[in-house]
């Protein structure tokens, strides 16, 4: 994951200090891109241990259209706890927009179902897009989408994905986001009978929080280790049928976890 360390180093060298919504302050750059060839291994950060269970369960939760943290809590995942209300609700966040985008006629649009249908029927389409950024509902969301829009692309029998992340918490959030969308790409490729291609991460406001600088500098002293392989249950042919047990990360070796506070 040299690409990730290069991003972190770039922000340390060129970032501008900015005040932010949380009151913590950030060092920020605008516009950055990383590319990961999924044939080279599964792009999960190795210079600190990442919590794969949280990554997988969160993605499955998104795909089910769920916006209440009960499923996450039941599976030992706490990454959304700070934003949920007393009933565990988050408002119309990712899962709602992905699966139930409100249409003007009062019905809803299942963007994920439409995406899979389009990849299968018209893989050369330039409209293979899912958006979580709904301006009409942003104010009702506990946290507006950071990873706002993703697009798929099919060429030579390979499926690639590009994510646009408007707000990128480099130390805590971005490692999760890279792994999550790389995993989604593997899943969609399998159910559409395609091979995985590239995952491309594009960031807007790419920032290190002021209280993550010491941790980032520690991480930059570490050498990346070889990437592991993600194995999916080959029997699963329906994207929404994947379960936690259908994933196996083989050969993941990482440096020790580095603790850092979440800016809420």
Curated annotation (Swiss-Prot):
InterPro entries: Thymidate_synth/dCMP_Mease (IPR045097), Thymidate_synth/dCMP_Mease_dom (IPR023451), Thymidate_synth/dCMP_Mease_sf (IPR036926), Thymidylate_synthase (IPR000398), Thymidylate_synthase_AS (IPR020940). Catalyzes the reductive methylation of 2'-deoxyuridine-5'-monophosphate (dUMP) to 2'-deoxythymidine-5'-monophosphate (dTMP) while utilizing 5,10-methylenetetrahydrofolate (mTHF) as the methyl donor and reductant in the reaction, yielding dihydrofolate (DHF) as a by-product. This enzymatic reaction provides an intracellular de novo source of dTMP, an essential precursor for DNA biosynthesis. It is found in: Cytoplasm. Belongs to the thymidylate synthase family. Bacterial-type ThyA subfamily. HAMAP family: Thymidy_synth_bact. This is Thymidylate synthase. Keywords: Cytoplasm, Methyltransferase, Nucleotide biosynthesis, Transferase. CDD domains: TS_Pyrimidine_HMase (cd00351). Its main location: cytoplasm. It catalyses: dUMP + (6R)-5,10-methylene-5,6,7,8-tetrahydrofolate = 7,8-dihydrofolate + dTMP. It comes from the Bacteria. Pathway: Pyrimidine metabolism; dTTP biosynthesis. Homodimer. GO terms for cellular component: cytosol. It is an enzyme of class 2 (transferase). One of its GO terms (molecular function) is thymidylate synthase activity. (6R)-5,10-methylene-5,6,7,8-tetrahydrofolate binds at residues 51, 169, 263. The active site is at 146 (nucleophile). GO terms for biological process: dTMP biosynthetic process; dTTP biosynthetic process; methylation. Its EC number is 2.1.1.45. DUMP binds at residues 21, 126-127, 166-169, 177, 207-209. The keyword Hydrolase does not apply.
